[in-house]
Amino acid sequence: MGEVGESEKYLLNRHKEHHFTAGETVRDIIIGFSDGLTVPFALAAGLSGANASSSIILTAGIAEVAAGAISMGLGGYLAAKSEADHYTRELRREQEEIDTIPDTEAAEVAEILAEYGVEPHEYWPVVNSLRKNPKAWLDFMMKFELGLEKPNPRRALQSALTIAISYVLSGLIPLLPYMFIPIAQKAVVSSVIVTIFALLIFGFAKGYFTGNKPVWSALQTALIGAIASAAAFGMAKGCASSVFE
């Protein structure tokens, strides 16, 4: 395939684009933090509503954080591994089609370019050039026909660790007050304040990195966490009242 000319290289070097390229990592952090802040928070609030002691809430909360981190991390690993396996299967299938029905695949390249408004006299040289470079042809078909990018071979493990660590770090935040305040009914108030503040910060950061309105994202995230904890507290309080009546 041809190389970029000197004038094009000069223009590219003059203009360096700054795009955010860590989308997958941010997605994993969001998954881990959102569940890590919400689930242990709701559990601790629910147990507080059931009049459990701070030590019991702390023990149950840490157990949940450990189990949740393992479960979420494993889920992230399997999801990333499944994506990699899917890419490999499609890569083999596309390679087989290029080898067995090259004319049909070349016509598909022409069709793809035509959808971008490229005229026949303009895209046929491109098609013929790709046919001379099977590796580039295969890469073109994977990206533009199937919309698949080659996954990072370490992606599955990175996803698992990122989600699990994010879950642990965020899951311990709602439990911090129970480590220092022995009376659960007082600890839950501090837990609510600390966690809502953490949810606001997390929601703001999430909105900033995902291109949404940070303030709205912060309020939305905090509201969801507050509703989850209030529901858990209310249900536990109701169950405790009915059991001990």
Curated annotation (Swiss-Prot):
Gene Ontology biological-process entries = intracellular manganese ion homeostasis; iron ion transport
GO cellular component annotations of the record:
vacuolar membrane
**Family to which the UniProt record says this protein belongs:** Belongs to the CCC1 family.
Q: In which tissues is it expressed?
A: Expressed in petal tissues, but not in other parts of the plant, such as leaves, roots, sepals and stems.
| Protein encoded by which gene | VIT
- Spans traversing the lipid bilayer: 29-49, 56-76, 163-183, 187-207, 215-235
Please tell me where Fe cation 2 binds in this chain. 94, 105, 108, 141
Q: Which reaction does it catalyse?
A: Fe(2+)(in) = Fe(2+)(out)
Residues that hold Fe cation 3 according to the record: 97, 105, 108
Give the organism, scientific name.
Centaurea cyanus
Q: Which residues lie on this side of the membrane: Vacuolar?
A: 50-55, 184-186, 236-245
Q: Which UniProt keywords apply?
A: Ion transport, Iron, Iron transport, Membrane, Metal-binding, Transmembrane, Transmembrane helix, Transport, Vacuole
Q: What is the effect of changing residue 236 to E?
A: Found in purple petals of mutant line cornflowers; most likely decreases iron transport activity
Descriptive protein name: Vacuolar iron transporter
Output the Gene Ontology terms for molecular function: manganese ion transmembrane transporter activity; metal ion binding
| Result for mutant: residue 236 to E | Failure to complement the growth defect of yeast cells deficient in the CCC1 transporter when grown in the presence of FeSO(4)
